[in-house]
Amino acid sequence: MNAPASIEAVLASLQPREAASHDFRPRAFRAWVADLPLANVAETGRRVHAALLEMNRTRLPADERLELLRMLARPVEEVTAAVRRHFVGRPLPLPERGRKAARVAIELARQMALGFELAAREAVRGRGSQLAAPAAHGALEQLGRALLTVYQAYAPPPPELWRSLHRVYGLAEAHGLTELPASGPGRRATDVTATAGAAYKRLLLLSLACPYRMRQGEVRAVYEALAEWAADARLEPLGDPVRQEGLFVVHLDSDEPPRYRSLDRAACTPASCRVLDAAPLGERLRAALAAVREEGDEPLVTGERLTASLLRRLVLNWGVMPRRGFARAASRTPADVLVGLSAIHQRLRRERTPATEKGAGTPPQPVPGIEAVISGRAHFETGLPQAGGVPDVWDLAFDAGPPSGSPRMVVIDEDREERRPEPEPEYPVHRCRVEDISPAGYRIHCEPGGEGELQLKVGELLAVREEGEARWQLAVVRWAKCLGAGKLDVGVQVLFPDAEPGYARRQEAGAPWVPVLIVPEVPSVQQPASLLAPPFALRHTEVVNLRGLSGRPRPVRLARTVENTGCFAHYHYAAAGGEEGGTNGGEDDLDSLWGSL
């Protein structure tokens, strides 16, 4: 379902309007669009795709083609929005249905883009040259939507996608259209990306933002932000490599995204290469970073917004060429992988709790006190008065005694009914393969099969244990790529070589104990004490009660949020002083004093 690679071949094979099965006269086509069954997404998508395929094989005037494409904009958007739910917010690797949904969204956008490109080429050759700028912009905008879908599906770009992007920009540049405004329905006069040049730079910068290292909402947030930022970047023909600024180079005659100039080994000429300088975006990024710092990253929401941590990564991606801190070594070592904090906590707890210890490793239960009295359920008992007891004044009532034939006491207490504890879910151990290894992390390859179905997201917490090793290393997924057929490559960064399972609870009435992973302080390597917790269970700077599998709870303060990926939160913590429930001023205080001396 790929668009043709050669636009010349498409132009040469255009058929007259009379040969088409669809009536592409504007009035008739508007009626056809109005009759689309929008409630039936599959049928609407099938009809729209068929109409686009035939339209792109039909010779039409530029103005009519643009009018027809704008009629199809709303149905295409509705179909795309409907199929997005099959791959946005879904764990990786995507199932077959999710991959097909992404292909549908990409294909519709590419066919729309081809139609806009045909209109642009027809406009620059005919009398409607004023239509060429909006047509070229429309093509780049549609190709951008296809590229956004590629990144949100963590899929490799389909063949010829980047070639189409470069080709449309080359057409706009050759005819002086890159800075001309693209007017059209729904276009704001202040829309700074409403030029072909800005739309092209937006997509170059998106690809350079390391989108495979982002969560899907972050990719969308950067894409939306670049609608305002992209115009600030500079794109120039290749010049003096010493004097010309710009870290990135673009090959207009290739099917490749932009890359670092220092790593580019391909032949480059002023006619075929452009240099992208993202340095002018620095002021925009600094202003955005200052704004989000005032709000803070806590609590982190899962919506599409820019956070301080994301902006800092963008500054590095667009302004400084990253250097690998450690050399990679090839490997094909089998490894066991646990996905998610709950699975890791369960495995570590079971491995470190002797089977003979009854109840070990379970969450601590709160001591009954005034909170339990206030929040507990009411308890009612009725029964016969004891013989010889003092009569109650209510015994004078005619119905105070028990019914005849029921001389036994009745206890009504819902909480005392026998309840079966809910079984703990069993989390699978996945068998994968370590492909590349370095002191900082791994590239792991996973295929379908084995115990359970592997499902993860970028930012997920993993535990990895290579074959022959005894300990689980904690790691975080930094990037992912779906390779099709359920295969998945993930890049992970090792966080800690080990951790202790434990529990934490906020210091407020009725707060539950939540599972956490505790990493002790290691002063020799300047590693502060760390806590890995569910993403929204605890709050930055608050004091929580913390305990391991053994020992009493102790209060600690969450001193700093290292990161919150939306899958887990990483905090540095420090002792807050005292034990849970306060001190009694007796021997416990003296014991702590001897220890400090």
Predicted segments — roles?
Residues 10, 16-19, 289, 294, ...:
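N-terminal start-of-domain structural block
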Residues 185-381:
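Extended, domain-scale alpha-helical bundle/helix-rich regions
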